[in-house]
Amino acid sequence: VGFKAGVKDYKLTYYTPDYETKDTDILAAFRVSPQPGVPPEEAGAAVAAESSTGTWTTVWTDGLTSLDRYKGRCYHIEPVAGEENQYIAYVAYPLDLFEEGSVTNMFTSIVGNVFGFKALRALRLEDLRIPTAYVKTFQGPPHGIQVERDKLNKYGRPLLGCTIKPKLGLSAKNYGRAVYECLRGGLDFTKDDENVNSQPFMRWRDRFVFCAEAIYKAQAETGEIKGHYLNATAGTCEEMMKRAIFARELGVPIVMHDYLTGGFTANTSLAHYCRDNGLLLHIHRAMHAVIDRQKNHGIHFRVLAKALRMSGGDHIHAGTVVGKLEGERDITLGFVDLLRDDFIEKDRSRGIYFTQDWVSLPGVLPVASGGIHVWHMPALTEIFGDDSVLQFGGGTLGHPWGNAPGAVANRVALEACVQARNEGRDLAREGNEIIREASKWSPELAAACEVWKEIKFEF
C-alpha cells in the first residue's frame, strides 16, 4: 500500500480539456513558449500545477487533501497564429486558493513561481478573469469617476494635468510657484513626478505646504477646484501613511502613489485610507515596462490595470495611443475600457480574452501622459472621450511664454475640441483645422502651435 512515489507528468493531473469552468473560478490566459521537445499540453499543465497545488514530485501529504478541489487546471490550449511553437494556455483556479481582498496573494499564487520554470522558454500572463465573488472582496478605487466629478464639479470634458519639470532639483518654493502658474492658467491638476519623494533638495513636507498654498491661491483666483498629486510614496508603509495624513490635514483633494514600486500591499492600505478620508488617489505605473514590455514574457499591462482597479486608485497612467500604430490603439482602448466600464465583453481583437463583470466596482480614470502637446488634443479627445485625464508636462511648461500661458493654450485647445465634438464635427479628420481656428482668438494657443507644429514621435 502507501502512495505511488516518484515524478510523473503534470498533464496526467493538471491538463483537463473537458473541464467546465465555474463562475467562481479565476481564469488566466498565458502565452506559453515551451522548450523544444516539450509538448504544449505538458507545458500548460506545468503552469497550472506550479501556480496552484503542484510540486515536482508526488508527496505523501497529497493524500491528506482533495487535489481535485484545489488544483489549478489547464482546460484549453490554442496555438498562436503566426508564431512558431507558441500557445495560449487557459488555466482555471478554484477561488479557495486565494485570500480575500489581497491582490498581493493573487499575484504571488498566479505568477509567483512559475515564470522561472525550466520547461518553458518564456511565459506571459495575457489576461485574468476575476470572478464576481472575488471582486466583491475588494474595496476598489477610493472614489471612482462619478464621485470624483462631483467633488471637482467638472463635467462633460476630459480633465487636464501637468507634471512639474524639471522633475528633480527645484526647491520647494519654486516648485510650488510652478504649480500655481499652471493651475492659474486653467489646468485642473498638476503632478509630482513619480520619483519626487523626499530628497535632500526638497523634503516632502516643505513641498506639500508650498503646493497647498499654490492650490488655494489658484482656486481663489479662478473659482475652480484645483488639485496637485502629492506623491506619498515612501520607503516604508508607515512613512507613506504619514504623508497621506499630512496631505489630508492640509485639506488638499488628491494624493499619489507609485503602485508597482510601492507594492500592492502598500497601495491597498493607502486606497482604504483615501476612501475613509475623502482623498482622491492618483496612481503612477513606474516600473510597468520592466514587466509588460516583452511580447512573449512577463505580464500584459491589462492585467496590471485590472489589479490596480481591485487594489484601488482613482487615476492610472495608461499610455497615449497618439502617433503609434492602429493595432496598439485597439489594445490600449481595450484596457482603458476595463478600467472605466462596469461590464466588458470578450474581444480578442482588443486583447480581451475574457468577459469581465466588475459588479459596480467604481471605475478608474485613464491618464494619457508623455510627449503630447496641443496638436494631439483632437485625437486624444476622440480616442479617450470625456472620462480621462490628459497630462501635458513639457507640453505645458515648454510654452515659450511660461507655465500659465502654456496652461491657457492647453485649456483653450481642449475646450475647442469638446465644443467641436458636441457640434458634431469629426475630430479625427478636422482636428488640425479646429486647433487652427481656436488659435485665432487665443495668442497663447497660437504660440504653442508655432513651437510644436513639426514634432512627431514616430520611429
From Swiss-Prot:
Catalytic activity: 2 (2R)-3-phosphoglycerate + 2 H(+) = D-ribulose 1,5-bisphosphate + CO2 + H2O; D-ribulose 1,5-bisphosphate + O2 = 2-phosphoglycolate + (2R)-3-phosphoglycerate + 2 H(+)
Residues at the site labelled Transition state stabilizer: K324
Pfam short name (any one): RuBisCO_large_N
Subcellular localization: Plastid, Chloroplast
Residues bearing PTM N6,N6,N6-trimethyllysine: K4
UniProt EC number: 4.1.1.39
Residues reported to bind substrate: N113, T163, K167, R285, H317, S369
Modified residues (N6-carboxylysine): K191
Broad enzyme group: lyase
Stored PROSITE patterns: RUBISCO_LARGE
Keyword terms: Calvin cycle, Carbon dioxide fixation, Chloroplast, Disulfide bond, Lyase, Magnesium, Metal-binding, Methylation, Monooxygenase, Oxidoreductase, Photorespiration, Photosynthesis, Plastid
Biological process per Gene Ontology, one example term: photorespiration
InterPro entries: RuBisCO, RuBisCo_large_chain_AS, RuBisCO_lsu_C, RuBisCO_lsu_C_sf, RuBisCO_lsu_fd_N, RuBisCO_lsu_N_sf, RuBisCO_lsuI
GO cellular component: chloroplast
Chief location: plastid
Catalytic residues in the record: K165, H284
Binding residues annotated for Mg(2+), in chain numbering: K191, D193, E194
MF terms in GO: magnesium ion binding; monooxygenase activity; ribulose-bisphosphate carboxylase activity
Record PTM text: The disulfide bond which can form in the large chain dimeric partners within the hexadecamer appears to be associated with oxidative stress and protein turnover.
Sequence similarity: Belongs to the RuBisCO large chain family. Type I subfamily.
Assembly: Heterohexadecamer of 8 large chains and 8 small chains; disulfide-linked. The disulfide link is formed within the large subunit homodimers.
Function comment: RuBisCO catalyzes two reactions: the carboxylation of D-ribulose 1,5-bisphosphate, the primary event in carbon dioxide fixation, as well as the oxidative fragmentation of the pentose substrate in the photorespiration process. Both reactions occur simultaneously and in competition at the same active site.
Further information: The basic functional RuBisCO is composed of a large chain homodimer in a 'head-to-tail' conformation. In form I RuBisCO this homodimer is arranged in a barrel-like tetramer with the small subunits forming a tetrameric 'cap' on each end of the 'barrel'.
This protein's name: Ribulose bisphosphate carboxylase large chain
Organism: Ceratopetalum gummiferum
